[in-house]
Amino acid sequence: MRLFLSLPVLVVVLAMVLEGPAPTQAAPEISSTLGRIPDKLKEFGNTLEDKARAAIESIKQSDIPAKTRNWFSETFHKVKEQLKTAFS
């Protein structure tokens, strides 16, 4: 009984595989793909630019750069004073 049911299923699956891709699933032509590359690159560039601007603006708005600058300045002055006292 199993063999009787599996043979028609196997034939249908084999027919579907051998008929190839449907027209909507077929690969697009190379010329149309190459024609869309500049648009895709421009879209990618614009997206990247927007994200970079947002990241830079976020960094400018935060207080991390000011804290870092102050820490380096204080550390530099401490080292400078220690060197003055050591070599005086």
UniProtKB/Swiss-Prot annotation:
InterPro entries given in the database record: ApoC-1_sf, ApoC-I
GO cellular component, one term: very-low-density lipoprotein particle
GO molecular-function term, one example from the UniProt record: phospholipase inhibitor activity
Keywords of this entry: Lipid transport, Secreted, Signal, Transport, VLDL
Subcellular location: Secreted
Taxonomy, superkingdom: Eukaryota
Cell membrane as UniProt keyword: no
UniProt cross-references to Gene3D superfamilies, sorted A to Z: Apolipoprotein C-I
Signal peptide: 1-26
Biological process annotations from GO: lipid transport; lipoprotein metabolic process; negative regulation of cholesterol transport; negative regulation of lipid catabolic process; negative regulation of very-low-density lipoprotein particle clearance; triglyceride metabolic process; very-low-density lipoprotein particle clearance
Homology family: Belongs to the apolipoprotein C1 family.
PANTHER family: APOLIPOPROTEIN C-I (PTHR16565:SF2)
Its biological purpose: Inhibitor of lipoprotein binding to the low density lipoprotein (LDL) receptor, LDL receptor-related protein, and very low density lipoprotein (VLDL) receptor. Associates with high density lipoproteins (HDL) and the triacylglycerol-rich lipoproteins in the plasma and makes up about 10% of the protein of the VLDL and 2% of that of HDL. Appears to interfere directly with fatty acid uptake and is also the major plasma inhibitor of cholesteryl ester transfer protein (CETP). Binds free fatty acids and reduces their intracellular esterification.
Protein name: Apolipoprotein C-I
Biological classification of the source: Eukaryota, Metazoa, Chordata, Craniata, Vertebrata
